[in-house]
């Protein structure tokens, strides 16, 4: 599932690597267990794309109900809440607010 959070934030690569991300070419990847569940989450950051996938720890198969927005069963919602909490932590630890004004001024000065 794609998250649009990187439209407003930039990744601090050093902080992301310190947090536990692994650098693979131009991509940052994180794999972390979701506490209290039998799942783990893979977070992939490539450019301005942040992708989150949830997998079963025993079978390594993707937990597809997580990706269905209309699925509001209690268990799926609890998994989503844990993922959202992880994303909030990542936002606090690894991301910095984009300064659009400075980016525009920089772009204008280059043209």
Q: Model-flagged regions — what are they?
A:
Residues 9-49, 60, 111:
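Ser/Thr-rich, low-complexity intrinsically disordered terminal regions
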Residues 1-4, 53-111:
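Intrinsically disordered, low-complexity regulatory regions enriched in serine/threonine/proline
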């Amino acid at each position: 599932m794609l998250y649009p959070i990187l439209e407003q934030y930039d990744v601090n690569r050093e902080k992301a690597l310190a947090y536990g991300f692994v650098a693979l070419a131009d991509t940052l990847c994180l794999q972390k267990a979701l506490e209290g569940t039998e799942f783990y989450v893979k977070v992939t950051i490539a450019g301005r794309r942040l992708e989150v996938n949830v997998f079963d720890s025993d079978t390594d198969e993707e937990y597809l109900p997580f990706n269905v927005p209309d699925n509001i069963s209690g268990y799926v919602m609890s998994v989503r809440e844990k993922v959202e909490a992880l994303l909030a932590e990542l936002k606090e630890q690894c991301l910095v607010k984009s300064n659009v004004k400075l980016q525009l001024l920089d772009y204008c000065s280059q043209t």
